[in-house]
Amino acid sequence: MKYRIEAKDYFTKFTNEKVLGMTPAEHLKRKLEVVGHEFSEDADNIYYNDMFYLDSYVLEKGPGAAAEVLEEIHTGIQFHNATTAVRVEINASLVNEGVKLMSIEDSYIDVNVRIGRDTVIYPNTYISGKCRIGAGCILGPDSVISDCFIGDGCEIIKSVVKGSEMGNECKIGPFSHIRPDNVIGDKVKVGAFAEVKKSEIKDKTVIPHLAYVGDSEIGRNCNISCGVITANYDGRVKSRTIVGDNAFIGCNTTLIAPVNVDKDTYIAAGSTITEDVSEGSLAIARSRQTNKEGWVEKSKRKRTEKS
């Protein structure tokens, strides 16, 4: 009996990259040959790569029955069984390579993903595309990571990270959204409910929570406080915000792009920055506070008189 191997759609981006020294097609070819079947590139039949099921079936029924379990996927149950089997096989191979999965069954990891030793992956974590993840990371729970290069010792907790590059010892989350096309340096923190898009964030900068950084370049050792927004879109075009090293951007600041904030600057909380800020300056862009003494009592008397 002859079989042809074709590209599968089990994974987001299934390629011919090797897993444990062989491509997926080579894995299946070897298994077919072991049980006495001929492999042919130009055969008419198409059979899917359910290697886990093939192994268990052959052990139970013997080599002669192997052909019965190689079949196309036509139903939802067949798809579920196939993807579950392949997922478990991939995850088990990662465990054998030194990755620490808290649950082999409850994490989805594409065949193209490469993960360093001693990285811990918690349940309900989805890692897809061509991800390269370093050693000693903590990923999840409840995280989505796709097409990323992530350094050693990073933590990504309850967050979405897509199409970005990240250095070593970064902390992301919980509930952060790292959108595509970011370059994030070493020891950067992007905390709760913060969003970063198409930006460069340099080493040791912190964005602790509740901030939006888009189309920006943020220098080293900066503090982007709670409620900071880079207003990058004017309804027609998107513009960039540039912040120099060691800048402190106070709470609830809006940076109206295009704008440059030089190094070693302070932006007062509540400011709306529309002009460049020079090195070493304190920028204050908010209306002056006015306190009206006795206003509450006067207001009460007026309401009483009217009634």
Map each language-model feature to its residues.
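Terminal amphipathic alpha-helical/low-complexity segments used for targeting or macromolecular assembly
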Residues: 1-106, 111-118, 279-281, 286-307
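Structural signal for interior beta-strand "rungs" in well-ordered beta-sheet cores
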Residues: 100-285, 289-290
